[in-house]
Amino acid sequence: IIMEEGKVAGVRALDDRNGHVTEYRAPVVIVASGGFGANHEMLAQYRPELLNAVTTNQPGAQGEGILIAQAVGADVVDIEQIQVHPTVEQSTSILLSEGIRGDGAVLVNSEGNRFTDELLTRDVVSAAEWEQPGGWAYAVFDRKVYDENKSIKEKFEKKGLALSADTLEGLAAQME
C-alpha cells in the first residue's frame, strides 16, 4: 500500500511469475480483500455475537487485507456487516440453499413452533433463529421443495442429516 501525506495513494503489486513490481495509483483506493469470518480475534472485536455461530467460511477467511490496510492507517467502512445464513447444518457447517425458503420451506424451533417469515432477509431470519431455544431451527418442507432442490439429497440425505416422514406427526416424532 502506497501512503502519501497520511492517505492511501495506491498499491504496489508483485507479479510472482516474473518478479516485476507494478505500481497502481488512484485518487481513491478501495480495498476489497474478502472477509474475516474465520478470524476469532476480529469477530470478537467487530461482531462478538457471532463468535459461537456455526460458520460456512473457509479457514482462510482471516481478514489479512483488512489488517494490512488498517496497519497503514486506512479507514474501514461497514466492517460489522458480515453476511450470515440462517440455514446452516449445525454439526457440519453445510449450507442449506436459501432457495428452499423461497420455494416454501418453513423454519421451526426445537419446540416445533414457526418463529419468522422465512422470506425476510438473511440477517433478520438469522437473528430470529438465534433467539430460539438452542439458537437453531429445523427447515421443514414438502416433496415439491425436495424435488426442486437436488442439493438436499447430495448434501444432507446421503450423509444422514435429513429426516423424512409421510406426516407432520411422524416428522415431529423423529425430531424429539
Question: Model segments located where?
Answer:
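Gly/Ser/Thr-rich helix-start
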Residues: 11, 35-38, 103-105, 113
